[in-house]
């Protein structure tokens, strides 16, 4: 199966530092491992500190499936991620 790199940009309702505490928490790290998602990068925009970029890698279709699940979306929104602002692009290396 192909490996996809997925790039998310979105707004947050809290500070980047507070959002990172949740994103880097043991619970979220375990969730990523359980579903087969490898976070590669997370950062905030220089021009807008409430805009975040996250890059994940996983087998083809995994990220799309996981992040379209209504239960996962509820958990994501608890972190301060404003899900309705999410823009997603998917990339393949070959």
Per-region residue spans from a language model:
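Short, exposed beta-strand-loop hairpins at the edges of beta-sheets
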Residues: 77-79
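Short S/T/G/P-rich N-terminal loop/turn motif that feeds into the first structured element of a domain
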Residues: 1-73, 82-94
């Amino acid at each position: 199966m192909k490996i996809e790199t997925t790039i998310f940009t979105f707004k947050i309702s809290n500070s980047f530092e507070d959002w990172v505490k949740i994103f880097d928490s043991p619970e979220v790290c375990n969730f990523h491992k359980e579903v087969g998602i490898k976070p590669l990068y997370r950062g905030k925009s220089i021009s807008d500190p409430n805009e975040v970029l996250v890059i994940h890698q996983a087998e083809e279709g995994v990220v799309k499936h996981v992040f379209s699940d209504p239960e996962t979306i509820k958990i994501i929104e608890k972190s301060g991620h404003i899900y309705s602002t999410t823009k997603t692009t998917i990339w393949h290396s070959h």
